[in-house]
Amino acid sequence: MIVERIWTGNAYRNYNYLIACPETGEALAIDPLDHEKCLNTARVKGWQITQILNTHEHHDHTGGNAAVVAATGAKVIAHHKAAGKIAGMDRGVQAGDVIKVGKHIELECLDTPGHTMCHICLRSHTDEPALFSGDTLFNAGAGNVHNGGDVNALYATFVEQLARLP
């Protein structure tokens, strides 16, 4: 599994991610707000973005979807309850579902409500453990609950799921 972290350099201070299979060159774009940087990085690396995963429905995570889909034909994946909130969603996922990238990469979906009630994190099923946490968890703390979230749900996500991860 190759992970390319892309700094957006915007006021939101977001990171976008490309997860690529080294064997096939297929890539998953996670929250590709800065579609130009995501598309350019994939092109330079020789990867084909085939899927987009939105961790939740906020615009700073979904705003680049249309441009990436137009350029690549990628399928949009998000929480199953976000179907009416994320335009062009092709696949709804829930806890335990697996997103496959290329031949061997498997990312398990965790239903992690709190920041929003349609939030998911991805847990890597490779030799390199990783958690792609969207706005649930930051290096300096937890995500906020200001725009459609719930503090009790966020607390439960931390206690019942994230704290138990290896």
Where are these predicted regions, by residue range?
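Active-site HxH/HxHxD metal-binding segment of metal-dependent hydrolases
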Residues: 12-13, 27, 33-111
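Short glycine-enriched loop/turn motifs at secondary-structure junctions
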Residues: 22-24, 85, 138-139
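Glycine-rich, flexible loop/turn motifs
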Residues: 2, 15, 89, 95, ...
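Short secondary-structure boundary/capping segments
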Residues: 8-9, 20, 66, 83, ...
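Short, flexible coil/turn micro-motifs enriched in small/turn-prone residues
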Residues: 20, 58, 91, 109, ...
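Conserved beta-strand hairpin/beta-sheet module of binuclear metal-dependent hydrolase folds
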Residues: 1-47, 122-134
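Metallo-beta-lactamase
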Residues: 98, 116-166
